[in-house]
From Swiss-Prot:
Keyword Transmembrane among UniProt keywords: no
PTM annotation (S-cysteinyl cysteine): residues: C62
Predominant location category: Golgi
Function: Induces cell attachment and spreading and plays a role in cell adhesion. Enhances incorporation of BMP1 in the fibronectin matrix of connective tissues, and subsequent proteolytic activation of lysyl oxidase LOX.
Annotated localization: Golgi apparatus; Secreted; Secreted, Extracellular space, Extracellular matrix
Protein name, UniProt field: Periostin
Description of how the protein assembles with itself and partners: Homodimer. Interacts with BMP1 and fibronectin.
Segments for region (Disordered): 811-838
Species annotation: Mus musculus (Mouse)
Length: 838
């Protein structure tokens, strides 16, 4: 008896090794979960889920157990003995181990009696009862019943050859447990070494040539039996062979040839092909199909979008899953009962056509990837209002197939009734603000980026921790890139900024008190110059009850006033909807203290105060409206009267009082813009006329260059003003100017001057003079250079023609009278008595 102990120990070790709970394969992990769910029913009981109305059963995964459904269908829970165990009369659960027999006997133990019978009549029985080690993928009785009757009859009529070969094609010449069946493995069968494609999926499903293992790991003395849900058919063709032989796939075959992909489907691999039928192609608009087929890049993208680089059998799909296609984008494959859906649409009409390099599913819809679509075709159901308006107002036709564009598409509910009912010309301008001249993908956007629309407007990009915004509107998920452009989805209609912070406040009477205090604090320039600011602007309600004496008190302490006002201003542009909802965002104000912002239920809270209106865009920042005066809680007040005033206006916090304390003086930093002016010496060209020559002077040309980059900061003391000074050294050389045929010598003069630029931008002019019968020549010249016409007055300054003057010149009016060099005359010009034009 002693020698039996080591043998018994080895047997226990073997059984422990194959115990699903101790294995690491997906199948065994799901089996272990089913065992846990069934343990209340007794030892070695597994919980299975059966889809209602079918005979399909699955070991319970965690996900399916809690959902109570598989492929969207409700399931009922069954409790059965786990593989390798059996019940005993009068005892709970499955306390007994199944007897171990040879492979032939095990077929009967697992209930695969039809396979057992066919193994007997085909003379396979002797082989699987004898010596050896086999893996038998045995079709269930139901699988044989579902086999095509003609095929089954043919096997039964030739049991010694056809049936025997068919059964051998279900066998492998070694024992392989589910943990040995690796995903993507190809195992040679016992019939001509034809490959068996093994797939072992994360949800625990194991397939062989897309047949699902429904009862695995039935150990035999000379191998193992895995019961499968269908009969395996012999395969010897590739996906390419199948496409070339199927007449119903001729359109798809043509697309494969056009894109040079047909031959690649004949190579070794583990592909999944969703092949659209000819009927599917007939559903496409003819123009769309012709455009794609005429574009090799688009047709290649179309083909690759139908191919996966992994073998995906239908039986492995128990819920929605996302897969990457060869094209690079993803598709979602799901199931609804026995139907397979792609991107949420049931379209698979024939599944699991197994070939030697993959599997084919026939579909009745053509899958068009974004990369093969025109930019306007990228819009989804939530952007139909935008795309409909773009088409109705004639903008869609301007999006040329060979151009590149970016659509900034607001969602449907962003368009109010008032917007939709406005004048179509104005509505067209609004839509133009949502179309960019170039293709800009999501990954191309960065903070501070300037984008130009087809309407000529410039839009700013703001990138935050959890949001990307363009002007006042922030993106939602759904950005796509197509053949000639990209689309990004926005919550609201984008409103380009037109006015500065100061101009916005000035045109809104709600801010008149705050604006007056801001100007009294000498802070007006801060809101007029270029920059990026966020202003929390208090309305007049914030100062309700403040008397004129109290206002004078506040203005009288300039440091205090500046501290209070600058606490409402923070560097950077912060859009309300750009903040991560529900969390506090801490910003440092220009005054130096912190301000606390939070987005709650589409409302911006500023120091826990609700903003009455947010995201008012300006050219140098954004305004958020508050109806309370903001004050930094960490700054004490040392003046009794000021404290009384602040307590009168601010009731939501307790202001500290420290007698004698004063407000700090805040050094004001301003942006300075570098301007370089280049002066080019004038060139004189004499145009001969019939009576009077025309002097055409080009120059002096002045080029204004604005250098953008990091701002320069310098300290500006109180009372000091900032002036932009341009240094130049124009050189005027000696030349002769002919006026009415009389030569006038102008001596060479060289000077150095400083020009203080306080007015509008420098305009470039062209200098000319003439008159008499040379009007036709002058008129032609003016028509070409109508925006650059200047009349040169002898001894005086150049004069820029206004629009009305230009019109009169074009109509033949004569120039004005002579004007002294040291005097500029306003009003209409007249001819002098001498007849000399100026």
């Amino acid at each position: 008896m002693v020698p039996l102990l080591p043998l018994y120990a080895l047997l226990l070790l073997f059984l422990c090794d194959i115990n699903p709970a101790n294995a690491n394969s997906y199948y065994d992990k799901v089996l272990a979960h089913s065992r846990i769910r069934g343990r209340d029913q007794g030892p070695n009981v597994c919980a299975l889920q059966q889809i209602l109305g079918t005979k399909k059963k699955y070991f319970s995964s965690c996900k399916n157990w809690y959902q109570g459904a598989i492929c969207g269908k409700k399931t009922t829970v069954l409790y059965e003995c786990c593989p390798g165990y059996m019940r005993m009369e009068g005892m709970k659960g499955c306390p007994a181990v199944m007897p171990i027999d040879h492979v032939y006997g095990t077929l009967g133990i697992v209930g695969a009696t039809t396979t057992q019978h066919y193994s007997d009549v085909s003379k396979l029985r002797e082989e699987i009862e004898g010596k050896g080690s086999y893996t038998y993928f045995a079709p269930s009785n139901e699988a044989w019943e579902n086999l095509d009757s003609d095929i089954r009859r043919g096997l039964e009529n030739n049991v010694n050859v056809e049936l025997l070969n068919a059964l051998h094609s279900h066998m492998v010449n070694k024992r392989m447990l589910t943990k040995d069946l690796k995903h993507g493995m190809v195992i040679p069968s016992m019939y001509n070494n034809l490959g068996l494609f093994i797939n072992h999926y994360p949800n625990g499903v194991v397939t062989v040539n897309c047949a699902r293992v429904i009862h695995g790991n039935q150990i035999a003395t000379n191998g193992v039996v895995h019961v499968i849900d269908r009969v395996l058919t012999q395969i010897g063709t590739s996906i390419q062979d199948f496409l070339e032989a199927e007449d119903d796939l001729s359109s798809f075959r043509a697309a494969a040839i056009t894109s040079d992909l047909l031959e690649s489907l004949g190579r070794d691999g583990h592909f999944t092909l969703f092949a659209p039928t000819n009927e599917a192609f007939e559903k496409l608009p003819r123009g769309v199909l012709e455009r794609i087929m005429g574009d090799k890049v688009a047709s290649e993208a179309l083909m690759k979008y139908h191919i996966l680089n992994t073998l995906q059998c239908s039986e492995a799909i128990t819920g929605g899953a996302v897969f990457e296609t060869m094209e690079g984008n993803t598709i979602e494959i799901g199931c609804e009962g026995d139907s397979i859906s792609i991107n949420g649409i049931k379209m698979v009409n024939k599944k699991d056509i197994v070939t030697k390099n993959g599997v084919i599913h026939l579909i009745d819809e053509v899958l068009i990837p974004d990369s093969a679509k025109q930019v306007i075709e990228l819009a989804g159901k939530q952007q139909t209002t935008f795309t409909d308006l773009v088409a109705q107002l004639g903008l869609a036709s301007s999006l040329k197939p060979d151009g590149e564009y970016t659509l900034l598409a607001p969602v449907n509910n962003a368009f109010s009734d008032d917007t939709l009912s406005m004048d179509q010309r104005l509505l067209k301008l609004i839509l133009q603000n949502h179309i960019l001249k170039v293709k800009v993908g999501l990954s191309d956007l960065y903070n501070g980026q300037i984008l130009e629309t087809i309407g000529g407007k410039q839009l700013r990009v703001f990138v935050y921790r959890t949001a990307i915004c363009i002007e006042n509107s922030c993106m939602v998920r759904g950005s796509k890139q197509g053949r000639n452009g990209a689309i990004h989805i926005f919550r609201e209609i984008i409103q380009p900024a037109e006015k500065s912070l100061h101009d916005k406040l000035r045109q809104d009477k709600r801010f008149s008190i705050f604006l007056s205090l801001l100007e009294a604090a000498d802070l007006k320039d801060l809101l007029t110059q270029p920059g990026d600011w966020t202003l929390f602007a208090p309305t007049n309600d914030a100062f309700k009850g403040m008397t004129s004496e109290e206002r004078e008190l506040l203005i009288g302490d300039k440091n205090a006033l500046q501290n209070i006002i600058l606490y409402h201003l923070t560097p950077g542009v912060y859009i309300g909807k750009g903040f991560e909802p529900g969390v506090t965002n801490i910003l440092k104000t220009t005054q130096g203290s912190k301000i606390y912002l939070k987005g709650v239920n589409e409302t911006l809270l500023v120091n826990e105060l609700k903003s009455k209106e947010s995201d008012i865009m300006t050219t140098n920042g954004v305004i958020h409206v508050v109806d309370k005066l903001l004050y930094p809680a960490d700054i004490p007040v040392g003046n009794d009267q000021l404290l009384e005033l602040l307590n009168k206006l601010i009731k939501y916090i307790q202001i500290k009082f420290v007698r004698g304390s004063t407000f700090k003086e805040i050094p004001m930093t301003v942006y300075t813009t570098k301007i370089i002016t280049k002066v080019v010496e004038p060139k004189i060209k004499v145009i001969q006329g019939s009576l009077q020559p025309i002097i055409k002077t080009e120059g002096p040309a002045m080029t204004k260059i604005q250098i953008e980059g990091d701002p320069d900061f310098r300290l500006i003391k109180e009372g000091e003003t900032v002036t932009e000074v341009i240094h130049g050294e124009p050189v005027i050389k000696k030349y002769t100017k002919i006026i009415d045929g009389v030569p006038v010598e102008i001596t060479e003069k060289q000077t150095r001057e400083e020009r203080i630029i306080t007015g509008p931008e420098i305009k470039y002019t062209r200098i000319s003079t003439g008159g008499g019968e040379t009007g036709e020549t002058l008129q032609k010249f003016l028509q070409k250079e109508v925006s650059k016409v200047t009349k040169f007055i002898e001894g005086g300054d150049g004069h820029l023609f206004e629009d009305e003057e230009i019109k009169r010149l074009l109509q033949g009016d004569t120039p004005a009278k002579k004007i002294p060099a040291n005097k500029r005359v306003q009003g209409p010009r007249r001819r002098s008595r001498e007849g000399r034009s100026q």
